[in-house]
């Protein structure tokens, strides 16, 4: 998705390049990637996370959009809204381990509430759809509920138990493993016996790391 590089050659030899939407989304967006594990360490304390994200990402956006005055913006979603109103640009947001604070600060309700409110400001309701093209969050826990309301009720959740349409992409499918075995001269029946994998919907899926290790090291 990122405008920050030309990734066409990276994907040209893969199946994704044959899909009808490949050109539509390729390198069309500014991508904001937040790794919450690293941010927690850099921020210095759990209660500083929201402020740390707002301050640092707005600073980077100000460097990127020099013609737009973001000095009065205190929140990331406010800055994104201003940029969109001036340019019509939309963003892709990726948050790795979104639930770090929920897991690490399970007993600290004030920190959790502040963080959930930050996420709600970013994603809840119809306003964010004006400036966010796609938001993708990874984590262990399901979407957190704050009191009686879901903090992020406009997300689709995919898990190992309910992978839905993402089933063939969460691991190597059986057809992909057969193809890899052919390329590396390995016996598929051996892989099938040792790394039986798991069923996601209609797909028999194998752990990519286990398969790759076997191909490289036997």
Task: Spell out what each predicted region is.
Residues 1-218:
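Phosphate-binding site recognition
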């Amino acid at each position: 998705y990122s405008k920050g590089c030309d990734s066409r050659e990276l994907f040209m030899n893969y199946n994704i390049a044959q899909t009808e939407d490949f050109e539509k989304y390729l390198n069309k967006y500014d991508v904001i990637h937040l790794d919450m594990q690293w941010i927690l360490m850099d921020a210095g304390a759990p209660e500083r996370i929201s402020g740390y994200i707002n301050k640092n990402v707005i600073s980077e956006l100000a460097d990127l959009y020099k013609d737009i005055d973001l000095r009065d913006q205190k929140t990331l979603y406010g800055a994104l809204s201003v940029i969109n109103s001036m340019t019509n640009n939309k963003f892709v947001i990726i948050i790795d381990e979104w639930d770090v604070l929920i897991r690490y600060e399970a007993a600290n309700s004030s920190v959790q509430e502040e963080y959930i409110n930050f996420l709600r400001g970013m994603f809840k309701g119809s306003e964010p759809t004006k400036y966010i093209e796609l938001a993708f969050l990874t984590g262990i826990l399901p979407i957190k509920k704050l009191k009686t309301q879901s903090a992020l009720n406009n997300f689709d959740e995919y898990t190992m138990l309910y992978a839905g349409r993402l089933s063939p992409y969460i691991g190597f499918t059986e057809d992909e493993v057969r193809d890899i075995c052919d390329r590396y001269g390995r016996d598929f029946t051996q892989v099938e016996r040792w790394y039986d994998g798991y069923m996601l919907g209609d797909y028999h899926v194998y752990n990519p790391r286990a398969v790759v290790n076997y191909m490289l090291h036997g």
